[in-house]
């Protein structure tokens, strides 16, 4: 089994030293879902929600969250992201919104946490904007879809 990288030999949490790593292009994709009633989703789709464009707000929130991941997750490195993309898709057949994020950089550490944070915060923003009309929305699952670059190799979730 692989060792936990954020725990040192004394069992203490620490930030991983990446100074000796090579810079490579690294990319990660993540997804999240927000399940809701058909009427709530219809308000988002037709733009009749009183708070405005839910998707535009969630997209910007996800992008901002990716850029601030290092401030939210204690042992994450501050990263110079070169791409953050947040796609939102209404799925009326499932009464939900699907969020897919992509983060990329050329650097010494991966961007999985940035992609996951972007997806999570976009989902939370949808909840926040729609909670006045529906409080029992469900967020999840949130998961990593792919990662590439770095010495640990590539990852792709089995769908």
Swiss-Prot record:
The keyword Lyase applies. Pathway: Cofactor biosynthesis; molybdopterin biosynthesis. InterPro entries: MoaC, MoaC_bact/euk, MoaC_sf, MoCo_biosynth_MoaA/MoaC, Mopterin_CF_biosynth-C_dom. Substrate binds at residues 75-77, 113-114. GO terms for biological process: Mo-molybdopterin cofactor biosynthetic process. It is an enzyme of class 4 (lyase). Its EC number is 4.6.1.17. It comes from the Bacteria. Catalyzes the conversion of (8S)-3',8-cyclo-7,8-dihydroguanosine 5'-triphosphate to cyclic pyranopterin monophosphate (cPMP). This is Cyclic pyranopterin monophosphate synthase. It comes from Yersinia pseudotuberculosis serotype IB (strain PB1/+).
